[in-house]
Amino acid sequence: MPSFEEVRAAFPVLEQYAYLNAGTNGPLPRVAAEAMIAEELVDVAQGRGGEPYFSRALGMRDQVRAKLAALLSVEPTQVALTRSTTDGCNIVLAGLDLGPDDEVVTSDVEHFGLIGPLHASSARIVTAPEDRILEAVTDRTRVIAISHVSWVTGNTLDPVRIKAETGLPILVDGAQSAGVIPIETGALDYYAVSCQKWLCGPDVTGALVVARPEDLRVALPSYFAQSEHQPDGSYVAREGAERFDSGWIGTPSLAGLSKALDVAHEWRFERVAEMAAKCRAALAERFEVITKPNQAGLVTFRPTSDPTKLVERLRGDGVIVRELPRRNLIRVSCGYWTSESDLERLVTGLA
């Protein structure tokens, strides 16, 4: 098993920056970048067509799907390849055919990647504080749609418990949880993730877990999501969650994502928890910390000065964090690659 120092060395950006913003985009591993470049050069030299190209690309899709399934504790047949968490939310909410008589319960601190697709549906949206979701459920509630980890507060909800207590279908935004905390999605209906955040993959990569693919209508068909199609547009959807694949993903992105998924090791969840706890404790000495103890990888605090200027100043010091616009908050992302030195640079920069 590689040491922490060996894993940290896999990320070139950490040679210069205290990179504490995986909640937006994770650091790209060297092996992922090298794989992307190598695959791009193959495409340049050999073209992007013909049987060898498509066989290679489809094989890479299968490989990535299997790795994501293992990470999310499901079968590969339950994983669709998407471009983002938002993609996954749109696929599910469009396929559920919600009407004005249907209610969807969600929290009041959701990302637009979930709340946007919700408002594009015809359902009535009921919002509640993240700790009062169950109280908002009524006889009209058809779906519960929540984040596993809030992108704002950094607090963690328990979608498995909510599912067990209500018996309702549940759509989970897993953008801030996949790769951060252990995930058992087997008891859940729909789980959408982004792969460029904590999984450290290339841009425009994501996944959607669909527990029972045959129960969700294909509302957004894509070219490679059918087993056959006719000139008139009729088609036969692929078996399993592949029927919900968003579309074509280039071989460079697939190669990079496959390598990125191999970088993390078994101790990553413990390391994230340890670094987040240390970060929270250090910030709590001087600031109001919004994130409760023992959550996930995000730590959100309220600065005592202008957050925009403070984030800019920190960047000048080589510390990368995220301002949460219109909320007067700053968010710190602690990954399995985060070191004590990174946190010391953050604290020093805030002085």
Could you tell me what each predicted segment is?
Residues 1-351:
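Pyridoxal 5′-phosphate
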